[in-house]
Regions:
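Catalytic machinery of carbohydrate-active enzymes
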Residues: 1-114
Length: 114
């Protein structure tokens, strides 16, 4: 994992099953190639952090414990991610839950894809 510095960062959201996560490796790589000069931050579950770390594509991997209530997820995200560092979000999960995170990032006019 590269050194993380505060500059424009790109956040990738990916949860789901193991197979689903593995299928996201190619999109991770494509995003890394497209954003060579930005810090990539992955928001995922603890189970996937080791796999993601081994790719070497992320400057930072942030894990949350997803709860039954989206509000708890949002609190964890706000606590762990400095939203002012994020310039773009790729929501590779595209679920109702991850889509609900959009409002967190919309406050700072962050570009959202997904």
């Amino acid at each position: 994992m590269k050194n993380y510095s505060k500059k424009n960062s790109v956040l990738i959201i990916k949860f789901g099953g193991l197979g689903d996560f593995i299928l996201s490796v190619e999109p991770f790589y494509s995003i890394r190639q497209h954003h060579k000069n930005e810090n990539l931050i992955l928001l995922t579950e603890k189970f996937y952090s080791e796999i993601a770390q081994k790719t070497g594509w992320f400057e930072k991997i942030i894990t949350i414990n997803r709860s039954l209530f989206y509000l708890s997820d949002k609190r964890q995200i706000k606590k762990k991610i400095n939203l002012s560092d994020i310039k773009k979000v790729y929501d590779l999960q595209t679920s109702r839950r991850s889509s609900s995170y959009f409002n967190l990032f919309n406050e700072d006019n962050i570009e959202w894809s997904g």
